[in-house]
Regions:
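Positively charged, small/polar-rich N-terminal and surface patches that mediate targeting and assembly
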Residues: 1-85
Length: 85
């Protein structure tokens, strides 16, 4: 299994959550503050089977298309392995 931990700006969190749940991913959201994107961020947690990783990442790519080098960072994604017990 895999887990995505995504740190997104508050104004983007609802759109990303809605898109993920529309693709049948389950998402937990946590309001957070910290070093990556500073204030006004939401942490999204999403766990799924290994074969769905590409689909999940495609959702994020669709929500955050690549912009110019000077654009503001809107999302940080971490992909972790999850041990089943």
């Amino acid at each position: 299994m895999k887990m995505i931990i995504a740190i997104v700006n508050d104004e983007d969190s609802e759109m990303v959550t809605h898109t993920l749940t529309g693709k049948e991913f389950r998402v937990t959201t946590i309001a957070s503050t910290g070093g990556f994107l500073r204030r006004g961020v939401t942490t999204l947690l999403c766990v799924f089977e290994d074969e769905k990783l590409t689909n999940a990442l495609d959702v994020f790519r669709g929500c955050f298309p690549k912009a110019g080098a000077e654009s503001q960072k809107r999302c940080r994604i971490f992909v972790l392995n999850v041990a089943e017990t």
